[in-house]
A protein has these predicted regions:
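Long, charged/polar, soluble alpha-helical segments
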Residues: 1-127
């Protein structure tokens, strides 16, 4: 993998992980006025990393779908924790197993998009 790509991917994943750390540190997620923006930012950083990884490794036809875990039955905090775990796994696999790294990235994006959809349906208490 070209060093220029790996650094961009690592940076984007690290930013997303940092954002999820901040989300998890919130005492009451339902009252967090910045939750929507933070989730959007984490999802976009993850999407960007996935796009760069996909294009740099010819994975455009590979579209993994998260099926084993019923994410919708989890709390927002647990969903954020799961997304963070997927991102950390992706980062660990990046240099040695890019296809599996991409798979974990796509799973993280799916979890983050699920959280965003739930928040859209169920407004935050501060709204």
């Amino acid at each position: 993998m070209h060093a220029q790509y790996i650094l961009k991917i690592q940076n984007a994943i690290s930013i997303a992980i940092s954002i999820l750390d901040k989300i998890q540190a919130e005492q009451d997620l339902q009252k967090s006025s910045n939750l929507r923006e933070a989730l959007w930012h984490a999802a976009e950083e993850s999407e960007y990393a996935a796009a760069v990884l996909s294009l740099s490794h010819g994975l455009t036809d590979f579209d993994p779908e998260l099926r084993e875990i019923n994410v919708k039955k989890m709390t927002i905090r647990d969903q954020a924790r799961l997304a963070k775990t997927f991102l950390q796994d992706s980062l660990a696999l990046l240099g040695s197993k890019p296809k599996q790294s991409y798979e974990k990235l796509r799973y993280a994006v799916q979890v983050l998009r699920t959280i965003q959809a739930e928040i859209k349906r169920k407004p935050l208490e501060s709204d």
